[in-house]
Every structure is written in C-alpha cells, then in structure tokens.
UniProtKB/Swiss-Prot annotation:
InterPro entries: AAA+_ATPase, ATP-dep_Clp_protease_ClpX, ATPase_AAA_core, Clp_ATPase_C, Clp_protease_ATP-bd_su_ClpX, ClpX_bact, P-loop_NTPase, Znf_CppX_C4
HAMAP family listed in its UniProt record: ClpX
Cellular component terms per the entry's GO annotation: HslUV protease complex
Positions with a binding annotation for ATP: P117, T118, G119, S120, G121, K122, T123, L124
Protein name: ATP-dependent Clp protease ATP-binding subunit ClpX
Gene that produces this protein: clpX
Length: 427
C-alpha cells in the first residue's frame, strides 16, 4: 500500500494539474502549488495593488482642501499646514504617475521633517493627514529603536505595525504613512563620526536610511526576535511616505551661533527675544545646523522637505480647548451629556488652564491632563450627578475651590409650574 501511494503522481492542490503538466511543483505542509498558480497569484496581487493605488489617487484632495480639513483639527501652524498639504498631494500624484508607466521624468519621493516644540501639533498633523487620505498610518517612537542585533526594537517593526494597520494588505500598506516621533533623540553624540558603536543614535539613523529611501524589506509578521523561524512578508517601501518629527531642543542656539558669526562688532552679542528665537530664528534653519545637532548627512538627505512649527501662545491654547472638531472641552462636555449631566467651563477658567500649560511647558499636549485632574472627582461620582451641572471657574483651576455643582432646571419643569399656576386661578 505504501509503495502504491509513493507511485501516485503528485498534483497541484489548487488547479489539479499533474506534475508532468507543469514546470515546477512546490511542496508545502500536505499541499502542493504549481508555478502557473504562483504566477496567477502574483498577477492578482499586482492588479489589487493597482486598484488600491487608483482608489487613493482618484480621491486625493487638492492642497487647499487638505489645508482646509487640517484647519478643522489643528490650530495655527499655517506655514507647516501649507507645506504638508503640498508635499502629501505631490507624493500621491507621483505614485499615480509612476503607476501609469511614464518614465520620461523620474520623480523622487519627498519625505518630511517637522521641527517644533513639545505639544505644538506635529503628531496631530500627521494623524489628521492619514485620516483625510484614508491610508494606513502608524507611529513609532525613535527612542525605542536600536540597531539590529541589540536590545530594543528593530526598524522592521515599524513596517510590521504599518502592515497591521493595513490588516496585512500589502498593497495598501505600501501606500501608507509612517510617523517617527522624537527623531531628534537619535542624533549622534558628537558632530564627528563615532569611533565606538552608537547603537541607539547614529546606528538607528543608518538602519532607517534604506527603508526611507525605498527598498523591499523582509518584515516578520510576528516580530523579528521571538519567532526567528517564521516566513517573511516582502514590503516595498518606495511609496511609503515617512514623516519625522522632533523638538530639537538647543538647535536655536546652533542657528544663532552660525548667524552671529557673520555679524560685525557688538551687534552679534545683542540679546535675542525668546519669542523671536522660536518664531524667527528657526526660519533660518540650514542643513549644516541639523548636521551639527547630530543628524548624519545621509539621513538629512532622505528628508528633503523641512518645516518648523511655532510655540503655541495662550490665545492658541484657548482656541485648541474649544474650537476644533475634536476640541478637548467638547469631548468632556459630551462625556457628561452621556450621563445626563452638564459641564460648563467659564472663559476665565479656559485662560487659567492655558496659562497652566504654558507654565509647565507642555503645550497643547498638557491641556487634557490638566482638565482630567480638575474633573477627576466629578467623573468618579458621575452617576450621582444626573440632572446636575458641573461648573469650572478660574478659582477651581487655581485650586482654591472645588468644581461648583448645581441642579439643572429644565424648560419642561418651568412649563409645568406655569401650567399648575394657571390651573389654580379661579374661573
């Protein structure tokens, strides 16, 4: 019986063609696939890739429309929004051009570097762009990355997270956006090339070079180090848009030092207003400043578009609290509404919250934690606050008093009282 089974001719498990009818038959666990079926699968995947790209490029809005939607979510940063809108539009138009087969002019990919203080909106800009374009999006923290072979996270894990965001649709993932935060933290330790191995600084920059420029990376679907025997997914990064962001603390002094060197006499020593440093000095940013900060020239070369974000002032922070579609105060008000309670935040309280965030130097990022702290006790006993109004005043923000709780007098209750009074009047 065993001899007869061995003599039985092998067939493709998908098209049922016999071994002698095809060029190659590849064995798997209890299954076989022929070269013709493999080619058919490749054709299907290529067609799906074209359809996925067509869906993205056919619906891509103009730079003005992109900027308009960004305005709904991001306060201020007009120059950064304009630069991003144009860069993203050109990126996806480039994909459409490449897919069309035109090769008369080669269009290079333009990754983006965002430089701005903590809480200025770098991450929110990248997230909102991905939402507008409806493409897979993932974020990575550069501080957790290390060179391959060292303790920490491999660069390929960023691509794995993008694949997960695309539900392992390779064609879709290849048109996605990756945002790498805290990229200033992987600056090399000195301006000169390192003699000792810098595995979390220059080493990470070197590891990022290839995937940012465009390569076919082998991505481990279950993570690289825990499952070394797994099959790899091939992901082409040529059309993935990389946006890097960082605060680059201290780069203003590098710029000032460079620009002051060209000054004459005592003019070079004039104290520069801090506000001017944040808004004007960064506008003089040059590639040599980034190199001096610790980014290697090759890494800077992969980020041809550089834009800066301003420090947010008190007025901008108050606007962030109330105006955007996803404004923090709107979110908390909705949460209270869900429990049939009402939240009121007075204008003076909004200003006090903004001042607190400025004092802590946390920018917009710190606003939510301040409000969370103010409302913690109220949210803890929210079940008892049904038909109650919680009011946050300036004194509440300053910690002088607790949030003020009062009863809500509904219009229906007033109406019923009036009706009762009318009924009591004798005819």
């Amino acid at each position: 019986m065993v001899v007869e089974a061995n003599k039985k001719e092998l067939i493709c498990s998908f098209c049922s063609k016999k071994q002698h009818e095809v060029k190659k038959l590849i064995a798997g666990p209890a299954v076989f696939i022929c070269d013709e079926c493999i080619n058919l699968c490749m054709d299907i995947m290529e067609e799906e890739s074209k359809i996925a790209l067509k869906q993205i490029t056919s619906t891509i809005p103009t730079p003005q429309k992109i900027c308009s939607v960004l305005n709904d979510y991001v306060v201020g940063q007009e120059q950064a929004k304009k630069v991003l809108a144009v860069a993203v539009y050109n990126h996806y138009k480039r994909l459409e051009y490449v897919q069309s087969g035109n090769n008369d002019v080669e269009l290079n990919k333009s990754n983006i570097l965002l430089i701005g203080p903590t809480g200025s909106g770098k991450t929110l800009l990248a997230q909102t762009l991905a939402k507008i374009l409806d493409v897979p999006f993932t974020m990575a923290d550069a501080t957790s990355l290390t060179e391959a072979g060292y303790v920490g996270e491999d660069v390929e894990n960023i691509l794995l997270r993008l694949l997960q965001a695309a539900e392992f649709n390779v064609a879709k993932a290849q048109k996605g956006i990756i945002y790498i935060d805290e990229v200033d933290k992987i600056a090399r330790k000195s301006e000169n090339p390192s003699i000792t191995r810098d595995v979390s600084g220059e080493g990470v920059q070197q590891a990022l070079l290839k995937i940012m420029e465009g390569t076919v990376a082998s991505v481990p679907p279950q993570g690289g180090r825990k499952h070394p025997q797994q099959d790899f997914v091939q992901l082409d990064t040529s059309n993935i848009l990389f946006i890097c962001g960082g605060a680059f603390m201290g780069i203003d002094s590098i710029i000032t030092s460079r620009t002051n060197n060209s000054s004459i006499g005592f003019a070079a020593n004039v104290n520069i207003d801090k506000e001017k440093i944040n808004r004007e000095i960064l506008k003089s940013l040059e590639i040599e400043d980034l190199t001096k900060f610790g980014l290697i020239p090759e890494f800077i070369g992969r980020l041809p578009i550089v834009t800066t974000l301003d420090d947010l002032d008190k007025e901008a922070l108050v606007t962030i609290l109330t105006k955007p579609k996803n404004a923090i105060v709107k979110q908390f008000k909705k949460q209270f509404e869900l429990d049939e309670a009402e939240l009121i935040v007075e204008d003076s309280a909004l200003e006090a919250i903004a001042e607190k965030a400025l004092a802590k130097k946390t920018g917009a990022r710190g606003l939510r934690s301040i409000i969370e702290h103010l409302l913690l006790d109220s949210m803890y006993k929210v079940a008892e606050l049904k038909k109650q109004r919680v009011t946050i005043t300036e004194d509440v923000v300053k910690g002088l008093i607790e949030p003020i709780i009062t009863s809500i007098i509904t219009p229906t209750a007033k109406t019923s009282k009036k009706q009762a009074a009318v009924e009591d009047i004798p005819a």
